[in-house]
Amino acid sequence: MEDRTRAIGDAADAMTDDELETAIAALHARERELLVAGDSEAAFDLMGTKFVLLFTLESRRR
């Protein structure tokens, strides 16, 4: 999992703020769809990705 998180972080670092915001919104929408469908495991996986992107965006804004 750590390698995956690192790879996502590297990809997030290469994104613009607008790209990050768009990706975060898309992940959030998909996460909600998965939760409504009862697939909490897949939603949880997306949540982890979303948090990496959020952390990257917030770190830039400090």
Q: What is each residue range found by the language model?
A:
Residues 2-22:
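Short, charge/polar-rich alpha-helical segments
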Residues 22-62:
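Short, charge-rich amphipathic interface segments used for partner binding and complex assembly
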